[in-house]
Amino acid sequence: MEESDRVARRWEDLDIDILVKIFQSFDIIELTSGIATVCTSWRMACCDPLLWRTLDLSMMKSNFIKIPLEPYVYVDARSDKTLNHLLKTSLSLSQGNIMTLIFHFNLYVSDDLLTYTAERCPRLRRLVMPAWNRIKKTGICKAIRIWQDLESLTMPSIANPPYLLEEIANNCKNFSELKVMGPFDNFFAATIITYLPKVRVLSLRCSMLVKDTLISILDELRNLEVLNISHCLLIEIPPPPAPRRIMRELDQCILDKASRLREFLTCMKDSCLMCQRTRNDEGLMRWYKYEEGVWKADEVSSLSL
């Protein structure tokens, strides 16, 4: 073929579907690094819904120090600026198509940024929450009112759960999955029973769990299909003056009550590394001590990241 007959095809002339296929191999940092500004066709490809079903920010952690006053953390300004740029660019490109949003548990998102995010991904179905410290009651409640399609929530434990779960009950009619990371007491269980009685999947893995609280869940959540208490520190509190004791195995009463479930996921093995870690941390997992990303695991496939 003569040189004059050759036709050089430019990158910007590539078919949109091909560009989308290429961009699917990019991570979130690359997608938001400016490739959408190259030309019109690249921006169209960058905005394709296929790229934005899930926004995974689980690799992002805040650079912070603990302080004695609320919100008990001080976040470095540069860290905040990086998150703001990445999140706002992603939300602009996604054009409201994000259905799964994943934050790192050590990411300290501001109240204003959470509200901004909710307004720009109203179709959200699954949320993995960041740390609570900088999020106010008004902010999360406003977000939940927007996220009416929410079905699944993974959240750090919270001292006052009723206002949050009531908001979910009032606004998220298809809500069915809840994972709580951190302390889970009888008050939290009673709140779920009151406001989310139709929840079908509940994961409490790697938490401290009192036997009576577990029995309440099994007795009262009649729509529950899947319960994960793997690696939990299960405590029995007998009447005084007897001391509380750590249960090394489930008794027949619990097994009988759990037999109605489709899946009852447990692990209480002395040889299990995660069980050892929960015991060593006294039921309050210090995830920062362990391998990066180990907090994402869950024996329930729909909750694993």
Where are these regions (language model features)?
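The conserved beta-strand core of Leucine-Rich Repeat
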Residues: 1-305
